[in-house]
């Protein structure tokens, strides 16, 4: 009889009920749209052996920026939705900051993979600037 209940639930016209989607899941997917192992490999393959060490340093920094973004974005999401330690206004401000950082990361990743070679020195400087900014997107008062 319990099997019958399971079958009847699965065969409902509206389908089986699904658990609510976790609002704090899948931030990695956003990053992987523009910074993944294959994109990193493409950056490392550009240019000659001489610049390989510099490109390797740049890609390692992009890895760190991306990992920090996912970790901090997930943490802030959980602060709001799970732990309730920040209100909607604080959450919205932090999300806007994370979106801005993500746009900067996307721009840098696009420049790193662009044909015609971008100015690696300028890109290194922009990446260092992004690394220097607080990854948490917290205001000084927090």
Language model regions located:
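C-terminal motif of bacterial Sec signal peptides marking the signal peptidase cleavage site
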Residues: 9-10
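Internal signal-anchor transmembrane helix that establishes type II topology
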Residues: 1-6
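Aromatic-rich surface patch/π-platform used for binding flat ligands and interfaces
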Residues: 18-142
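Hydrophobic alpha-helical transmembrane segments in integral membrane proteins
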Residues: 13-16
